[in-house]
């Protein structure tokens, strides 16, 4: 990785998950796994839970790839997806308040609540029902749909 190359990024957090967000339309990262490992280190890097790559797709308004701090690619993070919604709107990459986001876990719908000054107040995302590998401590719930909103 070229240590002299400038990469434009923003670090954001959602309910304790902090990530480094990079728009791949304007930045190329040849080895995202290596970058995530290096940049996520708290003392010698930027410090984060991982790297989020924001891209474009013909199937969705935006795409999101999650590269965890260990270099492995994740499927979905609700907190990161809400940060993507806030970032793309407040950066002027979209004027839509209802966005589609393609992830490894499938298509997600983001709903943004924006104030009169153009600042995103909340971002809601519908998440899939979690898949638990250990069902011993699970409990049935009335409504399996999970909706997460970012509130200030």
Language model features: what each stretch is:
Residues 105-118, 122-140:
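Catalytic phosphate-donor-binding core of small-molecule kinases
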Residues 1-119:
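A glycine-rich beta-to-alpha transition motif near the start of alpha/beta enzyme domains, typified by
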Residues 139, 144-152:
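Cationic, amphipathic, low-complexity alpha-helical segments enriched
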């Amino acid at each position: 990785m070229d240590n002299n190359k400038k990469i434009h990024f923003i670090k954001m957090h959602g309910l304790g998950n902090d990530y480094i967000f990079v728009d791949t339309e304007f930045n190329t990262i040849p080895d995202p796994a290596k970058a995530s490992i290096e940049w996520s280190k708290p003392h010698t890097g930027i410090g984060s839970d991982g790297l989020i790559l924001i891209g474009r797709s013909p199937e969705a308004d935006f795409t999101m790839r999650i590269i965890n701090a260990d270099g492995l690619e994740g499927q979905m993070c609700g907190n990161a997806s809400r940060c993507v919604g806030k970032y793309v709107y407040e950066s002027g990459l979209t004027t839509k308040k209802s966005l589609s986001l393609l992830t490894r876990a499938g298509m997600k719908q983001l709903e943004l609540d924006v104030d009169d000054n153009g600042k995103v107040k909340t971002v809601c995302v519908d998440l899939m029902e979690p898949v638990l590998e250990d069902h011993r401590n699970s409990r049935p719930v009335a409504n399996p749909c999970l909706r997460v909103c970012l509130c200030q």
